[in-house]
């Protein structure tokens, strides 16, 4: 948002954009009540329900990054290099290795729960701990306690200098893709502004000129891949 919103304001100076940075579940609730004009979210199943219930006017793909399973460098569960996230979670559960879950309405928590279901597992016990916090805070706790968690790659890369001993262990599976969509809200108070934002953020110049290069200078790789189009 620190890059996108100033660029949007330069293109459309007639709009005042207020960003409310919350998890996808909370963002969709704001859309349901008409307290947001446009949403940028990454919880596809919840988004589809939102659209089916008539809360959204238009939904378009913007970009994706990926989720990664991170954990202590010592990797007591032995998941390093696995290509199947379900097998990795099964090992973590089998070893009762400490795992931190956000346990919130975020797209990341939704993805984590889907991965447990796909693995045929219901995580319970004192090894499976809820933080009730955002991604950055959950990563910090996992690093401090020597535990595992699911993170989006962008947040991990942005925070990794402060996450001593926490490393990426499982990466690359199709199931770990993290898709972002932009949604204009049916009850938008500024419907034209919402439509202009959707058209702008899905344009080739923004996808490839801003989104596709974001993070390269600082991290040596882009944090997001533009959606096709």
Language model: regions and residue ranges:
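Short beta-strand-centered segments that line the small-molecule binding cleft or hinge
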Residues: 28-43, 47-62
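Exported/periplasmic ABC-transporter solute-binding proteins
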Residues: 1-12, 16-17, 25, 29, ...
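Residue-level signal for tight coil/turn positions that link beta-strands
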Residues: 64-66, 96
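Serine endopeptidase catalytic core focused on the charge-relay Asp
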Residues: 69
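A short, structural micro-pattern
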Residues: 63-64, 176
